[in-house]
Design a protein with these regions (language model features):
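Active-site-proximal specificity loops/subdomain of glycosyltransferases
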Residues: 48-108
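N-proximal low-complexity "stem/linker" segments adjacent to membrane-targeting elements
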Residues: 1-26
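Short internal beta-strands
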Residues: 37-42
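Short, charged/polar "capping" segments at the starts of alpha-helices
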Residues: 19, 43-50
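Short coil/turn segments at beta-strand junctions that form active-site/ligand-binding loops
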Residues: 5-7, 35, 112-114
Length: 184
């Protein structure tokens, strides 16, 4: 099933996780209502995607072509210097934030009006649409709250505070490329 709008999906995943959920990758490619599923990651991931049996609907984008990890790491390290007090920022703590920056910055490479992000460990079970009958995208919200994310967000962006009880973090999200480009 394809949506009424034509767009691609990005799945940001490490090579280890791509292998760990290998049985799910076929379902992601089969059921997402997109033109192409682009797995985003390192050069090692490129090899795994190329060796997979996912077909022509699967592709690869090098994460460094979107935004290098070191750029995000160094930015967070600089902004959090007062908290770190000379300690090294653990690279593992940057991973989740890096994923969010990749999802946003992909808008600069995207040629379509929309693109979707999809978590590689989330398995679609049937065909679905990300748009209603009038072509408006669906927007998922959750009730998750992870205090450490908001502490970090307020450190990086002091003027941004949590003002609604819902979370906008979801296993999948549709992005309007133009809105995202304006936002960033």
């Amino acid at each position: 099933m394809m949506d009424t709008k034509i767009y691609d999906a990005i799945v940001i995943v490490t090579p280890a996780d791509f292998k760990r959920v290998e049985c799910n990758n076929q379902r992601i490619v089969e059921y997402l209502p997109v033109r192409k599923v682009l797995f985003v990651g390192s050069e090692e991931l490129k090899e795994l995607v190329g060796q997979s049996n996912l077909g022509d609907k699967a592709g690869f984008v090098n994460e460094n072509d979107i935004i290098p990890f070191e750029d995000v790491y160094n930015c967070m390290k600089d902004v959090m210097a007062d908290i770190l007090l000379g300690r090294e920022l653990p690279r593992g703590l940057v991973g989740w934030y890096y994923q969010q920056f990749l999802k946003m910055k992909y808008s600069a490479l995207c040629d379509d009006e929309y693109y979707m992000s999809w978590d590689g460990d989330t398995v679609p079970c049937k065909d679905f649409s990300m748009f209603d009958s009038e072509g408006r995208p669906y927007f998922d919200m959750k009730y998750e709250y992870h205090e450490e994310y908001f502490i970090t967000m307020e450190t990086i962006l002091p003027s941004v505070k949590k003002i609604v009880d819902k979370s906008f973090i979801s296993e999948h999200m549709i992005f309007n490329r133009n809105y995202m480009n304006e936002l960033i």
